[in-house]
Amino acid sequence: MSVSVIIPARNEKGNIEALIQRTPRMGKHTEIIFVEGNSTDDTWGEIQRQGAHYQEYYHIKWVQQDGKGKGDAVRKGYSIATGDILMILDADMTVEPEELPKFFNAIASGKGEYINGSRLVYPMEKQAMRFLNLLGNKFFSLAFSWLLGQNLKDTLCGTKVLSRENYLRLAANRAYFGEFDPFGDFDLIFGSAKLNLKFVEIPIRYRARTYGETNISRFKHGWLLLRMTFFALKKVKFT
């Protein structure tokens, strides 16, 4: 099996080289796909420089997203991916690239079909997740678990893995939930549940960010997630 690692990157210039150096080679072939989105710190220039520098040693692609939001960036990356297995890795490196082989082994062995990271099992580094964010994550995990009939500890972890084949099936049915999810979590989780894919969670260690600032707004994005949850409630439980 070949692997595509999709890395959405906005204002993550200081992490680009480390992401290339530390992303493991998995399966018969691994490609790294950076999707840059509306950065103000020359992330796009850094991706091009480091991508060209390391191209002899790694298979690297880079592209700029057309719209806004992580979900749009992920879909852009998927559109140019060639791997049998599609992985998402956040560019902030709060989940370390070295964790990815756990996800590869889970899907390649047939243990699961939709592999989701869980940051809420191991103790976190100090400052890795603010208290209100932690409460929000636990709330949405409970809400999504009830909606889907799945026991999910961390629905909003950015590291997610599924096969290219299943993603294409999911994308073909996307109209059921629509495309208003700017994060991509809702799209993948509910789409995978609708396809009855086997869910597996992989505990990972969540690190504090060492470069830049978070792209997440607690209240704005929390309210949007709440609206998405109620939308799913109507779709899943009452239709």
Task: Give the role of each language-model region.
Residues E12-N15, S39, K70, E96:
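Donor nucleotide-sugar binding loop of glycosyltransferases
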Residues M1-V3, N173-T239:
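Hydrophobic helical membrane-anchoring modules
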Residues T30-F34, W44-I80:
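Conserved donor nucleotide-binding strand/loop of the catalytic core
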Residues I7, I20, H29-S39, V63-Q64:
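Short beta-strand/loop segment that forms part of the nucleotide-sugar
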Residues Q65-I80, P97-G178, P182, R209-L226:
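Acceptor/aglycone-binding surface of glycosyltransferases and processive sugar-polymer synthases
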Residues E36-G45, M93:
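A conserved acidic beta->alpha catalytic loop
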Residues L86:
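Short aromatic/hydrophobic "clamp" motif used to bind/position activated sugar donors
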Residues E12-R25:
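Short, well-formed alpha-helical segments that are part of the catalytic scaffolds
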